């Protein structure tokens, strides 16, 4: 009898335990044992009410920089020289149309989309804003590539990074431009896509440099690289991106020299601290042979960065460098130690797929948001392993579509702001959908 009673109590206890576990499972407390739910891409909806119409008959140019400040207001760096004569007819005296006029290169929007400030630096590429009210702009001014620090409110130039007195032959000057005060009223440029027309269209070969001119150019490039080797501790090529790591008092610049160099400077003194290339190559190890930068879509990855390098720094101190022309992202420590390589949309040719790098707004920054200039998507990647979770957007000129998706920024609430070049030439906003 004693044994039977003991067995009965054991069965009762077993049933109770099973029931208790069922309750726990129903409450979701055993999810960790069953495995966490699969990460999914976030959803967003286009906000047609942001921004408000621009004042002063301005028409914005292509967006080459985008940043959100500590108050979740938005700074947009645009390229007024993208505008053509037909877009500047209100500047003529007398005007021959109701619109439009050249805008300043830097425009400040509040959360409601109103313009609350502006100033007019030489147009550039890449920007960041700090918590003290300063803007850092990568630009090309009179053939010199650099990063300049400005007072956001007054537009006063405060300081600039050390840079060479000249740029590589034929490289990096496309984002330069005069101030509005130097602009001839009513006279625009060739348009935002003129420099991107491929040499062969419809089987017709467009004009190419003569063999003699090509030989002379290669000789000039070789001489320049001997004068300014990869170890040059200053900005040499055009700037593609600027990022700040304020806790570490450091500024990161993506220098497009030799396909791309990650260059780190002291945020307070602008003194050079360190730099590296693809796969964590020391500056002294970066190749000057262009064959080491060659890339064919779906082919092997080049030994060095291919070009149009952008970057960002996560809260946990990892540096994500997007090599757009090679459809890949490299992950480093702050000291340049190579950790991982993520490949994305490797079939993409022309302008490449891996553009700007942003992070999801959660504390862990679990996701990467990658802007894609060529395919006109924002890709959502798992930050840990680079797995593509989804995408947003398609090519088009309607609201919520993209034509030349170039820049992105994310505010503290997870709202995505985008900026376009080419025929897009606008900023848009996308609200998270829960």
Regions found by a protein language model. Give the residues of each.
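N-terminal secretory signal peptides that target proteins for export/translocation
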Residues: 1-9
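Eukaryotic scaffold repeat domains enriched in small/polar residues
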Residues: 8-17, 24-434
């Amino acid at each position: 009898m004693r044994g039977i009673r003991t067995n009965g109590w054991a069965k009762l206890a077993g049933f109770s335990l099973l029931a208790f576990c069922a309750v726990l499972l129903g409450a979701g407390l055993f999810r960790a044992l069953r495995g966490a739910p699969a990460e999914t891409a976030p959803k967003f909806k286009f906000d047609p009410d942001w921004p408000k119409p621009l004042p002063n008959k301005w028409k914005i140019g292509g967006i080459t920089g985008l940043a959100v400040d500590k108050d979740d207001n938005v700074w947009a760096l645009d390229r007024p020289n993208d505008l053509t004569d037909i877009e500047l007819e209100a500047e003529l005296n007398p005007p021959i149309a109701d619109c439009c006029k050249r805008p300043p290169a830097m425009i400040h929007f509040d959360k409601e989309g109103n313009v609350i400030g502006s100033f007019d630096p030489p147009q550039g590429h890449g920007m960041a804003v700090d918590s003290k009210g300063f803007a850092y702009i990568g630009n090309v001014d009179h053939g010199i590539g650099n990063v300049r620090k400005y007072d956001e409110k007054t537009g006063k130039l405060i300081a600039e990074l050390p840079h060479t007195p000249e740029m590589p032959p034929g490289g990096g000057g496309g984002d330069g431009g005069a101030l509005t005060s130097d602009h001839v009223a009513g006279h625009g440029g060739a348009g935002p896509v003129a420099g991107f027309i491929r040499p062969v269209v419809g089987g017709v070969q467009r004009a190419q440099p003569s063999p003699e001119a090509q030989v002379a150019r290669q000789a000039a490039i070789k001489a320049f690289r001997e004068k300014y080797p990869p170890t040059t501790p200053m900005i040499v090529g055009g700037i593609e991106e600027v990022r700040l790591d304020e806790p570490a008092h450091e500024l990161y610049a993506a220098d497009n020299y030799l396909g791309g160099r990650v260059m780190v400077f002291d945020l307070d003194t602008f003194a050079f601290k360190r730099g590296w290339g693809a796969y964590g190559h020391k500056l002294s190890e970066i190749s000057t042979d262009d064959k080491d930068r060659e890339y064919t879509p779906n082919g092997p990855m080049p030994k060095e960065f291919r070009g149009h390098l952008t970057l960002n720094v996560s809260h946990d101190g990892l540096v994500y460098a997007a090599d757009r022309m090679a459809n890949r992202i490299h992950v480093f420590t702050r000291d340049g130690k190579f950790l991982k390589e993520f490949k994305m949309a490797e079939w993409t040719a022309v302008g490449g797929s891996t553009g700007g790098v942003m992070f999801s707004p959660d504390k862990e920054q679990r996701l990467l948001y990658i802007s894609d200039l060529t395919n006109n998507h924002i890709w959502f990647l798992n930050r840990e392993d680079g797995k593509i979770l989804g995408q947003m957007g398609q090519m088009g000129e309607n609201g919520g579509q993209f034509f030349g998706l170039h820049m992105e920024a994310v505010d503290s609430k997870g709202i995505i702001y985008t900026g376009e070049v080419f025929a897009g030439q606008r900023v848009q906003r996308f609200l998270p959908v829960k």
